[in-house]
From Swiss-Prot:
<keyword id="KW-0963">Cytoplasm</keyword>
<dbReference type="InterPro" id="IPR002019">
    <property type="entry name" value="Urease_beta-like"/>
</dbReference>
<keyword id="KW-0378">Hydrolase</keyword>
<dbReference type="InterPro" id="IPR050069">
    <property type="entry name" value="Urease_subunit"/>
</dbReference>
<dbReference type="GO" id="GO:0035550">
    <property type="term" value="C:urease complex"/>
</dbReference>
<dbReference type="Pfam" id="PF00699">
    <property type="entry name" value="Urease_beta"/>
</dbReference>
<comment type="subunit">
    <text>Heterotrimer of UreA (gamma), UreB (beta) and UreC (alpha) subunits. Three heterotrimers associate to form the active enzyme.</text>
</comment>
<comment type="pathway">
    <text>Nitrogen metabolism; urea degradation; CO(2) and NH(3) from urea (urease route): step 1/1.</text>
</comment>
<dbReference type="GO" id="GO:0009039">
    <property type="term" value="F:urease activity"/>
</dbReference>
<protein>
    <recommendedName>
        <fullName>Urease subunit beta</fullName>
        <ecNumber>3.5.1.5</ecNumber>
    </recommendedName>
</protein>
<dbReference type="GO" id="GO:0043419">
    <property type="term" value="P:urea catabolic process"/>
</dbReference>
<comment type="similarity">
    <text>Belongs to the urease beta subunit family.</text>
</comment>
<dbReference type="InterPro" id="IPR036461">
    <property type="entry name" value="Urease_betasu_sf"/>
</dbReference>
Amino acid sequence: MIPGELFIQDGEIELNAERETATLSVANAGDRPIQVGSHYHFFETNPALQFDRAKARGMRLDIAAGTAVRFEPGQSREVQLVALAGKREVYGFRGEVMGKLDKA
């Protein structure tokens, strides 16, 4: 074995398997491009993006880590979102949640 060497099994790796998803239509009503990263809490994206924010609460883009989606001015497109996992706590971003997503 070489230090740092990985032994990978044959087959496909399915991202976000068995996680809740939602598909939303998103429009950029602004005058500048808006780019959203893979792990940004979609509910808290730029207000110029128009979509059903309630359905996006606790969700992020269902894309590979480290990638992003760009919305040009006037552009509309459908995106697939996936539920955040782990503790389901959100801090930062635009400060609209600042705590647990699932209130007990």
